[in-house]
UniProtKB/Swiss-Prot annotation:
Complex I is composed of 45 different subunits. It comes from Bos taurus. The keyword Repeat does not apply. This is NADH dehydrogenase [ubiquinone] 1 beta subcomplex subunit 8, mitochondrial. Keywords: Electron transport, Membrane, Mitochondrion, Mitochondrion inner membrane, Respiratory chain, Transit peptide, Transmembrane, Transmembrane helix, Transport. GO terms for biological process: mitochondrial electron transport, NADH to ubiquinone.
Amino acid sequence: MAAARAGVLGVRWLQKAARNVVPLGARTASHITKDMLPGPYPKTPEERAAAAKKYNMRVEDYEPYPDDGTGYGDYPKLPDRSQQERDPWYDWDHPDLRLNWGEPMHWDLDMYIRNRVDTSPTPVNWNLMCKHLFGFVAFMLFMFWVGETYPAYQPVGPKQYPYNNLYLERGGDPNKEPEPVVHYEI
């Protein structure tokens, strides 16, 4: 009984201490506000127009993600283009992301920012890049084959060791005199 009472008093003390440390109106600042969350998927033309106005878009340009249960709601489906493709000389409100205030951001903006995926068209077409890559790899494989088939080593003499060609270390009889080895000097 005394242990239960001590436990209850300890819990009450912790609750009072926590109430004194953190004010009741405090919350974490990382949550998305209710205004930032997408609304329900628009079913009527009036709802579509209201959603387009909410995201500062024209009704003709507004197209929501398909209602397949992923939770995109009325968020607009923007083209899959990276921020790198946008004009670098324009006076953006947020120049690092190349965005203006009130402009809808791509749902996967973290994937399309400038230091990640670059979807801009390449100056050389894909087929030519592949031809150059595979041509280089084929040439290098051919050169490796030639080098393996026709080796070109520097001519060397036989390996020379000190102490009568390591006679004892190579298992020679210590009682016998080793045969003399001629060492060549350069």
